[in-house]
From Swiss-Prot:
Coiled-coil region: none
Role this protein plays: Sensor protein of a CBASS antivirus system. CBASS (cyclic oligonucleotide-based antiphage signaling system) provides immunity against bacteriophage. The CD-NTase protein synthesizes cyclic nucleotides in response to infection; these serve as specific second messenger signals. The signals activate a diverse range of effectors, leading to bacterial cell death and thus abortive phage infection. A type III-C(AAA) CBASS system.
Entry similarity comment: Belongs to the bacterial HORMA family. HORMA1 subfamily.
Full protein name: CD-NTase-associated protein 7
Organism domain of life: Bacteria
Originating species: Escherichia coli (strain MS 115-1)
Lipoprotein among keywords: no
GO biological process: defense response to virus
Length: 172
């Protein structure tokens, strides 16, 4: 009786093209949110997309959320994207499926980002070099809570990395 085994090693280099591909999908989600809810502005969407390209390319993104906040809590519609390494062949979903008609009266549009362990372990010089092209600087803030729950609904991937999208949903 014979047995055979083999190993396949696959390496991919994550490029700015891969980062742009994934960031463009997030920008499309934000444009759909804008169409239904009036925010974010075109200029903000462009800046968020540029920021995301820089953070994805550097490997410095942990999570980023875009959406509406009321009483220091995210409400529906809010989208959270979590960066990770792609395991296996992965999925690269089409953007979209933003639910229309949610009540955002009295809420403010907001974005919040957390950083990866690679960012936290980088030297200041490495951070300065990687982040020199950011369109704006974020300031420290407390992470908002969630009024509802998070539902995994999309995965965007390219070049061996992924962004998993979760959406805030109401308990109703």
């Amino acid at each position: 009786m014979s047995s055979y085994s083999y190993t396949v090693a696959e390496t991919q280099t994550f490029s700015v093209t891969h980062a742009r591909h994934m960031a463009a999908k997030v920008a499309t989600d934000l444009r759909r949110m804008q169409r239904f809810y009036g925010y974010p502005s075109d200029a903000d969407i462009e800046a968020y997309e540029e920021e995301l390209v820089v953070f994805l390319k550097a490997g410095y993104l942990g999570e980023v959320s875009y959406g509406f906040q009321k009483n220091n809590n995210w409400i529906e519609p809010t989208l959270r994207y979590t960066a990770g390494d792609l395991l296996g062949s992965g999925t690269d979903d089409d953007p979209g499926k933003i639910r229309p008609g949610k009540d955002v009266s009295g809420a403010s549009f907001y974005s919040f980002m957390t950083y990866s362990s690679k960012y936290l372990n980088a030297t200041q010089s490495e951070k300065d070099t990687a982040l020199k092209d950011l369109p704006f600087k974020r300031v420290g803030a407390q992470s908002p809570g969630i009024n509802g729950y998070l539902e995994n609904d999309k995965t965007y991937s390219a070049g061996g990395r992924s962004l998993t999208r979760t959406s805030v949903r109401n308990f109703v």
